[in-house]
């Protein structure tokens, strides 16, 4: 009964206006009130401020400044093995595995369309059919900048307008094609592991999605698909990003989906749904290495895993925040 009510709210509530209101409030300088809100947020979600470059909450002028806070250089060591792709975001893995032709796993027993996720771009979808995907959810407590899993040359970016459903266990189980319906920014890269897509998905109260090469992509929300292209690596105007380099950020929210071409990478065997992710840790290995490296993500303290799961609405019977 309660879940039915919560699900009904996803369709009834004015999600766009709530998102605009959240974005407006998060960008305002409110002095002591801003600090109070940040302090309450840190306490409620158990945010580890010792990792931040500026651990004092009084140093943030707005909530957005706090939300996209940079981390100290030493807290996310980068695995530099050239055969290894690394995790692009702090968070929890929602789902991962093989793309079955056009089907990507959204939740147990529920799939969505690869081509729909890519805004009907069948040529791009053809690059990833029967490939590999990883969906990472960033909870409110997480660092909200997104980094590169490997070196890449940006070739295409597509902004896709859409709904702003919350991303949580309930919606993943009950909203068909959730990630293919929500607002998103699709980034296509050429890499040494073949084509790779890194998709930043919005949700309720995700105030904005930004990239390092183009700044704020949304808002404004104009309701039309926008597409940009870039030349190959050696040409003037090309955009090259290094493994571990920041490529984008969320101001509130949400989800990152990675797509890899078939036969190019093997996901780290120990990773599964609800695995906790940390930027720079091993995500996958190349299939073309002569000797497969024996790598596993660094073990995390039990209290860190518990705090991440407590903050993640992907975990059933937990909070259903965005």
From Swiss-Prot:
**Reaction(s) catalysed by this chain's protein:** a 1,2-diacyl-sn-glycero-3-phospho-L-serine + H(+) = a 1,2-diacyl-sn-glycero-3-phosphoethanolamine + CO2
Could you say which EC number(s) this protein's record lists? 4.1.1.65
Q: Which InterPro entries match?
A: PS_Dcarbxylase, PSD-B, PSD_type1_pro
Active site as annotated: 90, 147, 254
Cofactor binding note of this UniProt entry: Binds 1 pyruvoyl group covalently per subunit.
Recorded topology in the membrane: Peripheral membrane protein
Top-rank EC class of the record's enzyme:
lyase
Needed co-factor(s): pyruvate
Keyword annotations of the record = Cell membrane, Decarboxylase, Lipid biosynthesis, Lipid metabolism, Lyase, Membrane, Phospholipid biosynthesis, Phospholipid metabolism, Pyruvate, Zymogen
- Compositionally biased spans, kind Basic and acidic residues: 303-322
Annotated GO biological process: phosphatidylethanolamine biosynthetic process
* Modification sites for Pyruvic acid (Ser): 254
Which compartments is it annotated to reside in? Cell membrane
Pathway it works in: Phospholipid metabolism; phosphatidylethanolamine biosynthesis; phosphatidylethanolamine from CDP-diacylglycerol: step 2/2
* Predominant place of localization: membrane
- Protein role: Catalyzes the formation of phosphatidylethanolamine (PtdEtn) from phosphatidylserine (PtdSer).
Q: Of which family is this protein a member?
A: Belongs to the phosphatidylserine decarboxylase family. PSD-B subfamily. Prokaryotic type I sub-subfamily.
Q: Return the PANTHER family for the record.
A: PHOSPHATIDYLSERINE DECARBOXYLASE (PTHR10067), PHOSPHATIDYLSERINE DECARBOXYLASE PROENZYME, MITOCHONDRIAL (PTHR10067:SF6)
Protein name according to UniProt: Phosphatidylserine decarboxylase proenzyme
Species for this entry? Salmonella typhimurium (strain LT2 / SGSC1412 / ATCC 700720)
Lineage of the native species? Bacteria, Pseudomonadati, Pseudomonadota, Gammaproteobacteria, Enterobacterales
What gene does the UniProt entry assign to this protein? psd
């Amino acid at each position: 009964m309660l879940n039915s009510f919560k699900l009904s709210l996803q369709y009834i509530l004015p999600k766009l206006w709530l998102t605009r209101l959240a974005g407006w409030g998060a960008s305002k300088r409110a002095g002591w009130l801003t600090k109070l809100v940040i302090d309450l947020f840190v306490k409620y979600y158990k945010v580890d401020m010792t990792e931040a470059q500026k651990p004092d909450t009084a140093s943030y002028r707005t909530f957005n400044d706090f939300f996209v806070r940079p981390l100290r250089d030493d807290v996310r060591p980068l695995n530099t093995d050239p055969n290894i792709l690394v995790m692009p975001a702090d968070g929890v893995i929602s789902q991962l595995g093989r793309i079955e032709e056009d089907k990507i796993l959204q939740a147990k027993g529920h799939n969505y369309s690869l081509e729909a996720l890519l805004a009907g771009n069948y040529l791009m979808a053809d690059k990833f059919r029967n490939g590999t995907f990883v969906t990472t959810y960033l909870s409110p407590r997480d660092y909200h900048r997104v980094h590169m899993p490997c070196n890449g040359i940006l070739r295409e970016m597509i902004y896709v307008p859409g709904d702003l459903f919350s991303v949580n266990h309930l919606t993943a189980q009950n909203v068909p094609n959730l990630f293919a319906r929500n607002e998103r920014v699709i980034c296509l890269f050429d890499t040494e592991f073949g084509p790779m897509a890194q998709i930043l998905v919005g949700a309720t109260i995700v105030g904005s999605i930004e990239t390092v090469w183009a700044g704020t992509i949304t808002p404004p929300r104009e309701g039309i698909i926008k597409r940009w292209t870039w030349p190959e690596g050696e040409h003037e105007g090309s955009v090259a990003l290094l493994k571990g380099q920041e490529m984008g950020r969320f101001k509130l929210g949400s989800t990152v989906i990675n797509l890899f071409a078939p036969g190019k990478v093997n996901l780290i065997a120990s990773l599964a749904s609800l695995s906790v992710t940390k930027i720079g840790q091993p995500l996958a290995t190349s299939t073309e290495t002569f000797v497969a490296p024996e790598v596993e993500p660094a073990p995390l303290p039990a209290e860190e895993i518990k705090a991440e799961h407590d903050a993640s609405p992907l975990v059933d019977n937990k909070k259903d925040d965005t």
